[in-house]
A protein has these predicted regions:
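Beta-rich interaction/scaffold domains
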Residues: 1-226
Length: 226
């Protein structure tokens, strides 16, 4: 008290610590685990510690209090909060059953890159909310860009049966019809870029080959009749 009185005589004023105390109480309650490590967090910790020292300093002047308070406010403002990864994690988890063989390669390749990027953000302790939101948006776009491949299971089965056929003894016309249908079926089977939206192409190849095989079988049946 005596020192303060002497200081006041010299024209200096003891600081009002009300604002500093309020800010110190507010920011002391922050969970720093929610903020990214680095220079910003270090500066905040230092400013908070300094504010605490000024608060308990009975001889602190107004300038000391104001400076300590402003440094604390600036440091708090500069803190960078970690991104909330909950929704991104759920989005990544939802892709667990996605299989490469079910999708067209172009869409899958884009999706794979986006998925890996999202996983890196999830593993990054320094990822900001902006990083998280960007990764989520890119992955969502990639997921909507995926296209299922056309179902070729029936086509594969009928091609297998067609390969086993012996064309000896059939008319040139029916053999030519069969060979054309078979070549078309194999070309469709080999096309890995046919999406589910192009299923009619696959179905048409199946039907053409079935009809060609039926023509051969009908010819054989007719030839065996007396």
């Amino acid at each position: 008290i005596a020192l303060i009185e002497e200081i006041q005589k010299l024209g200096f004023k003891a600081g009002d610590k009300t604002d500093l105390q309020n800010h110190y109480t507010l920011y002391s309650a922050l969970d720093l685990d929610q903020y990214i490590d680095g220079a910003e967090k270090d500066a905040f910790v230092e400013a908070l510690e300094n504010a605490g020292k000024v608060l308990v300093d009975g001889d602190a002047l107004e300038e000391d209090v104001v400076v300590a308070d402003q440094k604390l406010l600036d440091a708090a403002e500069a803190l960078v909060k970690k991104g909330d990864k909950t929704s991104l994690q759920k989005l990544v988890d939802s892709t667990a059953d996605y299989k490469k063989e079910n999708y067209l390669s172009a869409g899958w390749n884009t999706f794979e890159v986006a998925l890996e990027a999202a996983k890196k953000v999830l593993a990054d302790e320094s990822a900001t909310q902006e990083d998280v939101d960007k990764a989520k948006a890119v992955l969502t776009t990639a997921m909507t860009g995926l296209r299922y491949k056309a179902d070729k299971s029936v086509l594969e089965e009928i091609i297998g049966k067609a390969k086993a056929m012996d064309l000896t003894g059939y008319s040139a016309e029916n053999v030519a019809l069969f060979n054309a249908a078979f070549a078309k079926a194999e070309a469709v089977m080999a096309n890995e870029e046919l999406s589910v939206y192009e299923q009619p192409i696959v179905d048409a190849a199946v039907l053409d080959l079935q009809n060609a095989m039926k023509a051969l079988n009908d010819e054989k049946d007719n030839a065996s009749k007396p």
